[in-house]
C-alpha cells in the first residue's frame, strides 16, 4: 500500500463523504482530507458534488425522497468545503484525446480514467473511495491512493 500523500486530487465520492456527516465513510474521508497539506478539486468533481447533493434519492425501501440540499445550500456547502485551508482549484486542463486507453474496458470508466490522467499530469495522487479505480492505474505512474 502506498504511503499517505501530502497532496491529492479528490474524487467526487471523497468530497461527498467529507461533506455529509451521515455518509458511511465520513470519518475516514474527513480525516484523510484534513491530513493533507493540499487537496485539489476540479470543475468535474465540484459539478459531481452539486449534482449528487441536489438530486432526488431513494431510501432503503426504494421510496423517492427529495434532494438532500437545495441548489443554494449545495453551492454554499461546496463553497465552505473549498474555502478550507489547503484547497487548490485544479482546472480540467488535459484533453480527453491525450489519454491512454490501455486499461480502459468500458464506457463507464471515462471519468475515472480522466481524473487519473489529470492527477498524473500534475504529479498528484488521486484519492477515491472506490477500489475499482485501481484497475485503471499504471504502476509506472503516481499511485492511486484509496481512502478506505
Role assignments for model-derived ranges:
Residues 76-80:
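Acidic, glycine-rich loop-and-strand cores that form catalytic or ligand-binding grooves
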Residues 133-140:
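Short loop/helix-cap segments at secondary-structure boundaries that form the rim of catalytic
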Residues 47-50:
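Amphipathic alpha-helical repeat scaffolds of TPR domains
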Residues 54-57, 83:
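A basic- and aromatic-enriched beta-loop-alpha substructure that forms the phosphate/nucleotide-
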Residues 107, 141-148:
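Short, electropositive alpha-helical surface patch
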Residues 1-41, 56-73:
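Short, well-structured N-terminal submotif of metal-dependent ribonuclease cores
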Residues 2-3, 83-131:
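Active-site neighborhoods of divalent-metal-dependent phosphate/nucleic-acid chemistry enzymes
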Amino acid at each position: 500500500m502506498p504511503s499517505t500523500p501530502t497532496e491529492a486530487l479528490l474524487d467526487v465520492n471523497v468530497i461527498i463523504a467529507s461533506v455529509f456527516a451521515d455518509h458511511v465513510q465520513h470519518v475516514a474521508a474527513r480525516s484523510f482530507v484534513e491530513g493533507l497539506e493540499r487537496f485539489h478539486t476540479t470543475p468535474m468533481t465540484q459539478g459531481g458534488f452539486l449534482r449528487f447533493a441536489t438530486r432526488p434519492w431513494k431510501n432503503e425501501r426504494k421510496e423517492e425522497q427529495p434532494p438532500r440540499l437545495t441548489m443554494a445550500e449545495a453551492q454554499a456547502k461546496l463553497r465552505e468545503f473549498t474555502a478550507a485551508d489547503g484547497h487548490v482549484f485544479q482546472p480540467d486542463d488535459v484533453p480527453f484525446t491525450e489519454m491512454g486507453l490501455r486499461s480502459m474496458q468500458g464506457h463507464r470508466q471515462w471519468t475515472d480514467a480522466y481524473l487519473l490522467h489529470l492527477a498524473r499530469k500534475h504529479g498528484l495522487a488521486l484519492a477515491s473511495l472506490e477500489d475499482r479505480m485501481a484497475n485503471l492505474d499504471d504502476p509506472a505512474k503516481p499511485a492511486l491512493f484509496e481512502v478506505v
